[in-house]
Amino acid sequence: MKTWLMGFSEFLLRYKLVWSETWKIRKQLDTPVREKDENEFLPAHLELIETPVSRRPRLVAYFIMGFLVIAFILSVLGQVEIVATANGKLTHSGRSKEIKPIENSIVKEIIVKEGESVRKGDVLLKLTALGAEADTLKTQSSLLQARLEQTRYQILSRSIELNKLPELKLPDEPYFQNVSEEEVLRLTSLIKEQFSTWQNQKYQKELNLDKKRAERLTVLARINRYENLSRVEKSRLDDFSSLLHKQAIAKHAVLEQENKYVEAVNELRVYKSQLEQIESEILSAKEEYQLVTQLFKNEILDKLRQTTDNIGLLTLELAKNEERQQASVIRAPVSVKVQQLKVHTEGGVVTTAETLMVIVPEDDTLEVTALVQNKDIGFINVGQNAIIKVEAFPYTRYGYLVGKVKNINLDAIEDQRLGLVFNVIISIEENCLSTGNKNIPLSSGMAVTAEIKTGMRSVISYLLSPLEESVTESLRER
C-alpha cells in the first residue's frame, strides 16, 4: 500500500513539473499574429488553421446558455395555478320554489303566463279540489244544525229552572243570519213538544202523588174512627166485666162485647198497616216526581254536552275544508317571476305533488351546480375562487363569470359517463355577461364549465412531475 502511494505521488510530481515547464514557454507556442490578407496567401491548410474562428457561433452559444439559465430561474421562481375543471349548469339559488297541489284537483283558471312577473299576494292559479266544495257545504249545514240544537237545549235547560217555556230567540250571531223561518218554526215546535212531554210526565206523577195523599187522609180518618171505637168497646167490655162479676148479666153478653172489641182492634191494626204502605207509596211518588225533572234535566244537559262537543269537531272539520279550498287558490308568497309553467289547459286534472310551475323571486341569484371528479374533490375547499365559462357564449368574445365555492356535497353521485362524482355549488357575482355596452342575461339550465383554482405550483415542478412519477413508479417494479 505504501509503495502504491509513493508511486502515485511521483506521478503527480511528474505531471506538475511538465505543466510548469509548459506554462513558462506558453507564449512561444502561440502562432504569430497575421493580418487577414496575409492569411489569404498562406497554403490552404495553413490558412484554415491560422484564420481566427468567427465570434457568431460563440455568441449564439452564449445566448442559448443565457436563455436556458433564465428559463431555469423563471421555472424555479415562477408559479402557475392549479385548476380543477368541472362541468355543470346554472341553477337558481335555494329560494326558487316548485308549486305543487296538496291533493288531486281540477284546473279552474290559469291566471299567469310563462315569464310573467307578479307581486306578493297575486293569484297564480285557481284549482278545485275534488269534493272540497261539497264537503264544506255539508259541514256548514251540519254545524248550523248543531248550533240550532245547542240553542234548543239551552232554552229547554232554562225552562226547567223557570218551570215555564221561554220565548225562542236566536242569538245575534253571523251564522244564524240565514236561518229560514221554516227552520225557526220547526225548532219552536220541537221545543214546545219536548217541554209539553216533560210537563205531562210531571203532571201524571203529581196526580199519582195527590191520589196517594188522598188515600192517606182516608186511612187516617178510618184509623181515628177505629181508635175511638176501640176505646168505646174497651170501656163497655170493662163495664160488662164488672156487671158479670156482680152477676148482673150473663157471661154470654160479656163474650159478645169482647168479640166486638177484638174486631175494632184488628181493624185498627189493618188500617195502620195500610197507612204505613201508603206513606211508603207517597215517598216513592215524591221521588218519582222529582226524578222526572232530574232525568229530563240530565238528558238535556247530556244532549247539550254532546252537541257542544260535536260543534267543536265540526268547527275543526269546517276549518280543514276551508283550508283545502284556500289551498286551491295558489298565490305568490313574494314578488316572483313565473318559470317552467307546466299547466296550460283549464279543466285539466293535476295530481298530488305534481310540479305546476317554478317561481323565482325577482331578486334571486344564479349559482353553478358542478360535478367534480373523484380525483379533484380532495383539493377543493369552500371559499376557493372559480372561473365560470358559459358554453352558449364563447369566453374569448363574451368573457366569463367569477365565483366562489359555496358548498361541497361529500356524498358521491354515480354518473354513467364520469363514474363517481361530487356535487359542488359555486356562487357567482353577476347574473349576466357583459360585452361592450350590452348585458346578456343568463338563465337557469345553461351548461357551463367551472375552473376552480385549487392552489399554486412552480413551473419546474410541473415540468418534472411526469418524470418524477415515472421514476417513482419504475423504482417499484420488480
From Swiss-Prot:
Calcium listed as a keyword: no
Cytoplasmic side: 1-59
UniProt function note: Involved in the transport of hemolysin A.
One Gene Ontology term from the biological process aspect of the record: killing of cells of another organism
Keyword vocabulary terms for this entry: Cell inner membrane, Cell membrane, Cytolysis, Hemolysis, Membrane, Plasmid, Signal-anchor, Transmembrane, Transmembrane helix, Transport
Superkingdom of the organism of origin: Bacteria
Subcellular localization, as worded in the UniProt entry: Cell inner membrane
Coiled coil: none
Primary residence: membrane
Recorded family membership: Belongs to the membrane fusion protein (MFP) (TC 8.A.1) family.
Protein name per UniProt: Hemolysin secretion protein D, plasmid
PROSITE patterns: HLYD_FAMILY (PS00543)
NCBIfam families noted in UniProt: type_I_hlyD
InterPro entries the UniProt entry points to: MFP, Secretion_HlyD_CS, T1SS_HlyD
Pfam families: HlyD_3 (PF13437)
Membrane spanning stretches: 60-80
Gene Ontology, cellular component aspect: plasma membrane
Natural source organism: Escherichia coli
Topology within the bilayer: Single-pass type II membrane protein
